[in-house]
C-alpha cells in the first residue's frame, strides 16, 4: 500500500490528490473528505483559525493511523494532508483520501482515519471570532465516533 502524509502551511489541490489516488486499474473506489474552516461555531461568527502541531510527532501519529486503517481494510493508497498556521473562514484544512478495490472499504477507511485524526493526532486549534479567540478541544461526539472503531 502507498500512503503519504503531509503537514503543511500551503493549501492543497483536491483534483491533484484525487488523480494520485485514482492511478491504476485496481482502484474501483476513491473516497475523499475535505474539512474546511466554518464561518459559525458555538453561536459565534468565525473569521479564521490558527492550527499548531507537534512537529515529527504529528506526522508519526498520522502514519500510525494510516497503518491501522490498512490493517482493517484492503487499501491501495491513502493520502492525509493537514494544514497548519493561519486560515480564513472557508479555507481548506484537511484532506483524507483513500482508494480500494471496493467502495465499502474506501468509505469505512476514510471515516476511520478522520475519526482517529480528530482524537489522536496532536493538533491544537485556536478559533478566531469577531469578538475574541479561543482554543478548541475535541468534542465528545468526536470521541464517540472514534470509540465505535474499537
Swiss-Prot record:
Q: Which reaction does it catalyse?
A: 2 [molybdopterin-synthase sulfur-carrier protein]-C-terminal-Gly-aminoethanethioate + cyclic pyranopterin phosphate + H2O = molybdopterin + 2 [molybdopterin-synthase sulfur-carrier protein]-C-terminal Gly-Gly + 2 H(+)
User: By its UniProt entry, which SUPFAM superfamilies does this protein fall under?
Assistant: Molybdopterin synthase subunit MoaE
User: What keywords does the record list, in alphabetical order?
Assistant: Molybdenum cofactor biosynthesis, Transferase
Q: Provide the binding site for substrate.
A: 36-38, 102-103, 118, 125-127
Cite a GO CC annotation. Answer: cytosol
Biological processes annotated in GO: Mo-molybdopterin cofactor biosynthetic process
Entry GO MF terms: molybdopterin synthase activity
EC assignment = 2.8.1.12
This protein's assembly is summarised as: Heterotetramer of 2 MoaD subunits and 2 MoaE subunits. Also stable as homodimer. The enzyme changes between these two forms during catalysis.
Q: Which family does it belong to?
A: Belongs to the MoaE family.
Q: What is this protein called?
A: Molybdopterin synthase catalytic subunit
The record lists the organism as Vibrio cholerae serotype O1 (strain ATCC 39315 / El Tor Inaba N16961)
Give the lineage.
Bacteria, Pseudomonadati, Pseudomonadota, Gammaproteobacteria, Vibrionales
Question: What gene name does this entry carry?
Answer: moaE
Amino acid at each position: 500500500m502507498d500512503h503519504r502524509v503531509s503537514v503543511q502551511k500551503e493549501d492543497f489541490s483536491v483534483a491533484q490528490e484525487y488523480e494520485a489516488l485514482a492511478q491504476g486499474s485496481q482502484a474501483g473506489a476513491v473516497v475523499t473528505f475535505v474539512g474546511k474552516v466554518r464561518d459559525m461555531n458555538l453561536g459565534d461568527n468565525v473569521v479564521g483559525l490558527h492550527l499548531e502541531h507537534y512537529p515529527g510527532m504529528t506526522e508519526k501519529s498520522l502514519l500510525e493511523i494510516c497503518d491501522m486503517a490498512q490493517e482493517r481494510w484492503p487499501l491501495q493508497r491513502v493520502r492525509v494532508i493537514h494544514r497548519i498556521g493561519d486560515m480564513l473562514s472557508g479555507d481548506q484544512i484537511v484532506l483524507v483520501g483513500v482508494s480500494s478495490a471496493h467502495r465499502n472499504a474506501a468509505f469505512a477507511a476514510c471515516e476511520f482515519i478522520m475519526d482517529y485524526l480528530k482524537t489522536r493526532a496532536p493538533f491544537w486549534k485556536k478559533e478566531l471570532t469577531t469578538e475574541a479567540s479561543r482554543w478548541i478541544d475535541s468534542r465528545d461526539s468526536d470521541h464517540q465516533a472514534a470509540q465505535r472503531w474499537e
